[in-house]
Amino acid sequence: MMSSDDLFLRAFENSAGHMANLDAVKSIVERLAGQGHSLDDIIQLLEREMEGAEVTLQTDLRILINETQHLVRRKTST
């Protein structure tokens, strides 16, 4: 069974090719991963990161959130 961090990192790997601000998102992912957060907490923290961020970073974080949610749905449907 995948841990929350494993699933979050997989979501980042899956979506990284679609991001304009890869270094900024990678920094956020590295900061959040390994902290023992639940996926719901990670998504809330990412949404907080979006507040006040420039538009392309907001879009990149939304891509990451969507991919994380997609993997969660896939995991729970199998």
Predicted regions: what they are:
Residues 18, 39, 53-56:
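Alpha-solenoid repeat scaffolds
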Residues 37-44:
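Short, well-ordered alpha-helical segments
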Residues 30-33, 47, 69:
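Alpha-helical repeat scaffolds in large eukaryotic proteins
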Residues 2-4, 9-16, 45, 49, ...:
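Non-catalytic all-alpha helical scaffold/repeat segments
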Residues 51-78:
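Charged low-complexity stretches with an acidic bias
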Residues 2-36:
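N-terminal acidic leader/helix
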